[in-house]
Regions:
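Conserved N-terminal phosphate-binding loop of PLP-dependent enzymes in the Aspartate aminotransferase
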Residues: 1-268
Length: 268
């Protein structure tokens, strides 16, 4: 709780499993409140949440979805960082809104402060759960332990994985006490290896290393340096159309094929 700001945690084996658990918690929360009437989920275009059926259903990229449709129903898509687009999708049947705090595969787009605060306020007003996916952007990558901590908001449910175990397969979804008490109960969800001793030892060590090696401070310092240098490249080369990101999660948008650049970078 001290690190994440959340109250309860359920350990999984991967990020996709964490998303599955988060979606189930949201659906169960709405079911206990309203029965089978309010089960719609709003996700974002160009998002990525995983390749299992539930996670894929809230992934807004046809490249991943097409071969596996029809997917889980009652999912609507809105445009990221466009509050009006989200608002128009909300109805009395909406139970959750899910998005990455920083869209990764979608092009390195951090949520704007206005967008995330407006969505949070809308969720509070309509008793809709806000699910923030921190699987790619969390664990210090943006300069804070979780990217949402840079905004004056808090999710109802958060997903985490990847760097949380530093290479050991582990994921988690975290909830506020309110959601935990009014959603999943014993038998609603399970995992064979989630929370196993090896995984939890790895997580514990990763957390220790964050403090011992001043990782967050280093991300802020090196992130500022990277931002400055990428800005210089953006000015220097016409083929670079945009520079976006925060901390060490940054990217360049180019109007040319970048395969050669990527291969050279890997070699170097």
């Amino acid at each position: 709780k001290k690190i994440s700001g959340m109250d309860r945690i359920f350990f999984t084996n991967s990020g996709a499993e964490a998303v599955e658990g988060a979606l189930k918690a949201a659906r169960k929360y709405a079911f206990l409140r309203d029965g089978h009437t309010n089960h719609d989920i709003i996700a974002m275009n160009h998002s990525f949440h995983g390749r299992t059926m539930g996670a894929l259903s809230v992934t807004g990229n046809v490249h991943y979805r097409e071969a596996f449709e029809p997917l889980i129903g009652n999912v609507k898509f809105a445009d990221f960082n466009d509050f009006e687009s989200v608002k128009t999708q909300v109805t009395d049947k909406t139970c959750a809104i899910i998005f990455e705090t920083v869209q990764g595969e979608g092009g390195i787009y951090p949520a704007t402060e206005a967008f995330i605060k407006q969505v949070r306020a809308l969720c509070d007003e309509r008793d809709i759960l806000l699910i923030l996916d921190e699987i790619q952007c969390g664990m210090g990558r943006t300069g804070t332990m979780f990217a949402w901590q840079q905004y004056d908001v808090k999710p109802d449910i958060m997903t985490s994985a990847k760097a949380i175990g530093c290479g050991v397969p582990v994921g988690a979804f975290l909830m506020t006490e309110k959601v935990a008490q009014q959603s999943l109960t014993s038998g609603d969800h399970g995992t064979t290896y989630g929370g196993n001793p090896l995984a939890c030892t790895a997580i514990s060590k990763v957390i220790d290393l964050f403090e011992e090696q001043r990782i967050l401070e280093n991300v802020k310092e090196t992130g500022a340096y990277l931002y400055k240098k990428l800005d210089e490249l953006t000015i220097k080369y016409d083929c670079i159309k945009a520079h976006r990101g925060v901390g060490l999660m940054q990217g360049l948008e180019c109007d040319m094929s970048v395969n050669g650049v990527i291969n050279r970078a890997i070699q170097k």
